């Protein structure tokens, strides 16, 4: 059979968590479908921090929707932890769900009956295997050093619809924080390259020295200048 959402959704095998005594909590997609939450639309070059989803505080039910060029295909990112109704999940971390909406499949209740899954997770371990509880342990992000979902990562940020076949919106530095929140960068821009400062002038006086050097106007930079006497036995460190 196909993976679908397996243990990660109440509408799939998640209803049997803890032998059915503690079914998994609602996913971000399910809460959005019911009109209970709205997705956060991300802005490029921004770091997002997500509180724990389903933590009995409506303000914490935050999920980010990464849209493709086709409005019917997108990713959902939410931070899930083993607490509350989620206590018996196979793992904890950021769940990334890949939605490929097809009205006919939704209406006929055949969302995941085909090789092109209408709703399934993107597993951090690149292994859609639900044959055992342990096999699901690597599904959430980050996992075993895998902390980025990009066009070239493994798994890759693939698409099912259109000719593009890649999302083209890197999600990087996926991190679980000590306080239980989870963070990631969305389409992070390149860091500016800082060149080595060049001394442009030095003016010696009886009581000191004045030096000027090239500066990086687009960067917040702190410079250190070490002044040494001729005998090189002592030095004075100045910050500018």
Describe the function of each predicted region.
Residues 1-89, 100-102:
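Extracellular hydrolytic enzyme modules, especially secreted metalloproteases
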Residues 12, 78, 212-214, 226-228:
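Residue-level detector of conserved, well-ordered beta-strand and adjacent loop positions
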Residues 53-191:
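Extracellular low-complexity, Gly/Ser/Thr-rich intrinsically disordered linkers
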Residues 70-71, 178, 204-207, 218, ...:
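Short strand-connecting beta-turns/loops that link adjacent beta-strands
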Residues 100-102, 217, 229-233:
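Solvent-exposed strand-loop boundary residues in beta-sheet-rich modules
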Residues 183, 210-212, 224:
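Beta-strand secondary-structure signal
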Residues 190-220:
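Pro/Thr/Ser/Gly-rich low-complexity, intrinsically disordered linker/stalk tracts
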Residues 222-240:
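Recognizes extended acidic, P/S/T-rich segments that occur
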């Amino acid at each position: 059979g196909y993976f679908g959402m397996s243990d990660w959704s109440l509408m799939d095998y998640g209803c049997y968590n803890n032998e059915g005594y503690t079914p998994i909590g609602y996913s971000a997609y399910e809460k959005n479908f019911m009109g209970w939450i709205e997705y956060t639309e991300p802005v490029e070059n921004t770091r997002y921090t997500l509180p724990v989803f389903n933590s009995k505080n409506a303000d914490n039910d935050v999920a980010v929707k990464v849209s493709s060029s086709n409005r019917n295909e997108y990713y959902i990112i939410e931070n899930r932890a083993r607490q509350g109704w989620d206590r018996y999940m196979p793992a904890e971390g950021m769940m990334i769900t890949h939605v490929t909406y097809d009205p006919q499949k939704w209406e006929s209740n055949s969302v995941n009956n085909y090789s092109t899954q209408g709703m399934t997770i993107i597993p951090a371990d690149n292994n859609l295997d639900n044959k055992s509880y342990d096999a699901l342990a690597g599904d959430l992000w980050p996992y075993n050093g895998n902390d980025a979902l990009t066009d070239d990562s493994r798994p890759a940020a693939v698409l099912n619809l259109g000719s593009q076949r890649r999302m083209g919106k890197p999600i990087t530095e996926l991190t679980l924080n000590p306080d239980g929140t989870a963070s990631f960068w969305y389409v992070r821009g390149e860091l500016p390259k800082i060149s080595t400062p060049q001394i442009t002038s030095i003016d010696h006086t009886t009581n000191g020295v004045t030096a000027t050097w090239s500066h990086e106007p687009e960067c917040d930079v702190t410079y250190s200048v070490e002044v040494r006497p001729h005998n090189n036995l002592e030095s004075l460190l100045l910050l500018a």
